[in-house]
């Protein structure tokens, strides 16, 4: 099975916990015989619209996009709004019906919705959203679990 992992920042440029967790998940899938391609924006101003690199055994497709981390709100909003457009423009020539068997994408970036939809339609596959920041406090506040369950 070939999975596309989509996240708004990734190793080695990111030290954020989300990128580390997704990398560990990718390595686990690879250890179980699957193939993983991470699709992520470049944090550096790259000259190519798409750079393909390997990190450990994970294929990483970095597309050119403006910064979305550690920048002002207006700049971040513009760059996040353009993420799906920039990603699809960069990867569309590499994505065929048989490229991916599934998509795993990491919240909270709602701006990947159009990209996920395009890949799902092209590859006729399912997508799975990894929700974060809902446990434990959100679940307690919503009354789903009690503070004693932690």
Per-region residue spans from a language model:
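N-terminal subdomain of nucleotide-sugar transferases
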Residues: 1-59
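Acceptor-binding helix/loop patch of EC 2.4 sugar-transfer enzymes
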Residues: 8, 68-75, 98, 125-150
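Short, glycine/serine-rich, charged loops/turns that create anion-binding
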Residues: 10-11, 43, 67, 110, ...
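Short glycine-/acidic-enriched loop or helix-start segments at secondary-structure transitions
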Residues: 15-16, 47-48, 72, 113-116, ...
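Short, glycine/charged-enriched secondary-structure capping and boundary segments
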Residues: 18-21, 51-53, 75-76, 117-120, ...
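A conditional alpha-helix N-cap/helix-loop micro-motif detector
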Residues: 18-19, 80-84, 150
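A conserved catalytic-core segment of Leloir-type glycosyltransferases
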Residues: 39-94
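An aromatic- and histidine-rich active-site surface loop
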Residues: 84-91, 100-125, 129-132, 137
């Amino acid at each position: 099975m070939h999975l596309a992992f989509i996240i708004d920042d990734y190793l080695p440029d990111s030290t954020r916990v989300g990128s580390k967790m997704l990398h560990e998940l990718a390595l686990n899938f690879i250890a179980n015989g699957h193939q993983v391609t991470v699709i992520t924006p470049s944090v550096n101003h790259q000259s190519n619209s798409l750079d393909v690199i390997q990190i450990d055994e994970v294929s990483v497709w970095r597309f050119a996009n403006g910064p979305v981390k550690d920048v002002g709100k207006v700049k971040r909003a513009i760059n996040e709004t353009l993420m799906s457009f920039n990603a699809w423009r960069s990867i569309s020539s590499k994505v065929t019906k048989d490229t991916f068997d599934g998509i795993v994408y990491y919240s909270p970036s709602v701006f990947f919705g159009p990209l996920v939809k395009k890949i799902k339609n092209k590859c006729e596959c399912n997508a799975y959203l990894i929700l974060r920041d809902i446990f434990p406090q959100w679940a307690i506040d919503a009354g789903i679990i009690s503070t004693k369950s932690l």
